[in-house]
A protein has these predicted regions:
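Terminal intrinsically disordered/low-complexity segments used for targeting and assembly
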Residues: 2-10, 14-74, 239-286, 329, ...
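Amphipathic alpha-helical coiled-coil segments
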Residues: 82-96, 168, 174-194, 202, ...
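Short helix-capping/hinge motifs at transmembrane helix termini and TM-loop junctions
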Residues: 214, 253-255, 314, 424, ...
Length: 468
């Protein structure tokens, strides 16, 4: 008999050791992540520092823009929704921690019964009454780490949502800055257009004077009036774009559309320099909130696989109930005679369940693989955004240098053509052509400045800046 008991103990230990070898595994970051060479520099850049580590107050040094960003971080509805979901994740995390504790239920029941007067049973003098107040407890032992894995999975989901909040903040900061500088650009383009309208008006007066002296015909006057109307037509287009940008900023601020105050003395030409500090690609892992969120999603999926695998192992549960059970309330307190209790220890091993547990485990593994793919893709996306922004800044800055030269030469050509016309050596067509070229080239130059500014905003966000 003792030998059989020894065999049972040895077998039980062997089973435990077997399942222990299949127990949960901790998350390890893959060594095959595409980190090196994530972005492609197009010029010599400073990798010893990273603009992503700069707070948005230092990166965007315009006080009015800083005020708008601060207001948006407090009132933007997308950020509020992300924070709300974070609070939900916090509740689920608390629930996962409480799973280690036993459950406790208390039930109160009462019954009254009697028998028929005309049946075979002896009818008691009074109806039979019974009262029960039972407390039932149940506890699952976390011998395979299922509950621990579930808690770690929930922790990862909480941190994932926390990173999502930061990612939302960086996007809102970038959106506010982008729209703000778009407004500044539109203001400059409107100013340029108004200045050119003044020039068109002066030219019209010159042509009318020349017509009086028979140096030009009515055709020249009509052409000058046409070009003045052409220049004036730009203003409503610009005003419409300004209104749209102001409405968009108001939306980001959680407000109804309203006028947006902005600086009028910003020198946009200072933005076309290529003085950039981007750090090293590996820093994207610690700076980019969306990359962090993708890795936390992978951590959660890994722990969910542990949960699904542990569900296939034996489950040890302890349960019990205790409470008074008596015919009447007065008998409740006749303890211990009135007490009803039981205690149960159970070890349950799933055998046949319609492949439910195996399917859950296989699907959980596939979901972990999918999360790893998404994590790798998020890294590539981040590197691609940085590479695109660097390329755009570099080549657009070169373009701006030539456009500055173009504007200066066209202004000279316009002045020379006017002098030639007044002195009888040029034609009004030369003047109109030069005048149109000046207007279009100046508008185009400010659009180029805006592209550089927008790409620097994108680069700052792409490197992970904006949430500190």
């Amino acid at each position: 008999m003792k030998r059989w008991i020894l065999y049972i103990i040895i077998s039980a230990v062997a089973v435990v050791l077997f399942f222990e070898s299949c127990a949960v595994t901790s998350y390890q970051r893959s060594g095959q992540l595409p980190v090196d060479g994530l972005f492609r520099p197009v010029t010599n850049i400073d990798t010893t520092q990273n603009i992503a580590t700069i707070s948005f107050h230092d990166f965007y040094n315009d006080p009015l823009l800083q005020q708008l960003i601060t207001e948006a971080l407090d009132s933007n509805y997308n950020i509020q929704l992300a924070v709300n979901r974070l609070a939900q994740m916090s509740q689920y995390l608390q629930q996962s921690k409480a799973a280690f504790l036993p459950t406790l239920d208390i039930g109160l029941s009462g019954s009254v019964s009697d028998v028929s007067k005309y049946g075979n049973s002896v009818r008691p003098e009074n109806p039979y009454t019974e009262l029960q107040l039972i407390a039932t407890a149940r506890w699952e032992a976390d011998i395979w780490g299922k509950l621990s894995s579930a808690k770690r999975s929930q922790q990862a989901q909480y941190f994932q949502q926390e990173a999502t909040v930061r990612a939302t903040q960086t996007q809102i900061v970038a959106d506010i800055a982008s729209a703000y500088y778009q407004l500044i650009t539109l203001d400059r383009q409107r100013s340029v257009t108004e200045k050119n309208i003044k020039s068109y008006t002066d030219y019209l007066q010159t042509v009318e004077d020349l017509k009086k002296s028979a140096q030009v015909t009515e055709v020249a006057v009509l052409q000058a009036k046409s070009q003045l109307a052409y220049a004036n037509a730009y203003l409503p287009q610009i005003d419409a774009s300004i209104a749209i940008e102001e409405n968009y900023i108001s939306l980001l601020l959680g407000k109804a559309p309203e006028h947006i105050s902005r600086s009028s003395d910003i020198d946009l030409t200072r933005f076309h320099s290529e003085d950039l500090t981007v750090g090293v690609p590996a820093q994207l892992l610690s700076n980019r909130p969306d990359v962090q969120a993708a890795e936390y999603a992978l951590r959660s999926a890994h722990e969910q696989f542990n949960v699904a695998r542990a569900a296939m192992y034996p489950q040890l549960t302890l349960s019990g109930s205790v409470g008074p059970d008596a015919k009447g309330l007065a008998n409740w307190f006749n303890m211990p005679g009135s007490l009803l209790w039981n205690a149960v220890a159970g070890l349950t091993q799933p055998i046949l369940n319609g492949r439910t547990l195996k399917t859950q485990k296989e699907v959980a593994k596939l979901q972990e693989d999918a999360a790893l793919i998404s994590f790798k893709q998020s890294l590539l996306n981040a590197g691609n955004e940085v590479s695109n922004a660097l390329a755009s800044i570099h080549f657009t800055a070169q373009q701006a240098k030539y456009q500055i030269e173009q504007v200066e030469e066209l202004k000279k050509a316009f002045e020379y053509s006017k002098e030639l016309l007044v002195n009888g050596y040029g034609t009004y067509l030369d003047v109109l052509s030069a005048q149109n070229s000046v207007l279009s080239s100046e508008l185009s130059l400010y659009s180029t400045y805006n592209i550089i500014i927008q790409q620097k905003i994108i680069l700052y966000r792409a490197l992970g800046g904006g949430w500190k």
